[in-house]
Amino acid sequence: MHKDSIRKLFFYYFIPLVFSMISLSTYSMVDGMFVGKKLGKEAIAAVNIAWPIFPGLIAYELLFGFGAASIVGYFLGQNKTHRARLVFSSVFYFVALSAFILSMALLPFSETIARFFGSNDALLSMSKRYIEIILMGSVFMVLHPLADVFVVNDKRPVLAMVAMLIGSLANIFFNYWFIFVLEVGVQGSAIATVIGHAIGVLVLMQHFWLKKGQLYFIKRFSLSSVISSAKSGVPQSTAEFSASIMILLFNTAIMHTAGERFVSMYGIVMYNAIIFFTTLFAISQGIQPIASFSYGARNLERVRAVFVFGLKAAFCIGIVFYGVYYFLDEFLIKLYLQPSEQDPLFMQETKRAMNIYYVGYVFLGMTLLCAVFFQSIQRTKSSFIITLSHTLGFIIVLLPILSHFYGINGIWVTYPIAQFLAFLVALGVTYYEIKKGVFTTYKEQNLVILKT
């Protein structure tokens, strides 16, 4: 990793990452497609109401996983492999146990959670059943991306991709089996999702059990490793948790402003946005191990080059993806609708919503890149400021104002306006960090890890 070109290293990580993350994202997309095609728009609305539980679970994983991955990459760059194993093992043990305990504690409150997410009486039964199944299998849904990020940092991105693809294919098969063959309703989609993640975890675990890389389990536990990882992972965890709150806010605003029909519409917009967002996030994740390793090795010129390359990639890919989505909007919408539900007015309104909403993703790609980059080199405060701005910072202010004065149109324009403002914040933070010498002065990180 010291000598290879940044472009070569980026694509070495990015290509498997984008395939693995798109495979992960298709869990939700496949749920929406099968539910919509078999059960209709009301079922899509019910599943969309339950959707915030997914960012919530991923936020919990990122709180420990992304921070631990940055620290592990930092230690590997310094050739301190046993410390890297201590961080990996401690975080994995803690997350597995705590995720199981938390999910079992929340299970009796499934109906309360569904109502909190904005479900009305018509959607409550389906939303509740979906949430119950997801909670029962949530430990696999947390461990899958956690194991994935450690495998990537252990220089096995192809294995991470294969695990995600296998799990995704299993999810597709079982979605079809439970919904179309057994006809068990929306809970069948939830069961398929859990099974897919469980299979993905099993594929990844053999890498650690068989000690195929530098990272494997050791019989030690360090609470300070967990705490340091959590501190380092706060920005990305906040981003994902805020995404859960954002979906809740949009669902609530749309339900009050325009009703269930437009909640279904927003569900389709968000399902189709998954691959767009995932690709942008994969760009950021692709530079993370390179930036962390280079910073640990004190190669600041390489750190700067990684950042510049990542920004260019995020901008170009964002523009290309927006163009693809703009010209394929009608085709993408029909993926989630029964033929009888594809009325011209609904289609036209959904296309308009997509074309407005997705402008925000062009800015989001570069903002995400800045947030993940600063997190990768342990600039947690800067990363947190950027993260807060692109998640809830502006949305929570703009959404009630614009929805009040402009109705549903105000809701759609909220997202791109908020992301443009967040991008300006990211530029300001980057300027501040450059003035502080982020690319010219190495700062030894005070990572509180048990000495080995």
What are these regions (language model features)?
Residues 106, 149, 175, 179, ...:
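Structural signal for membrane-spanning alpha-helices in multi-pass inner-membrane proteins
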Residues 56-59, 171-175, 200-205, 274-278, ...:
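Hydrophobic transmembrane alpha-helices of multi-pass small-molecule transporters
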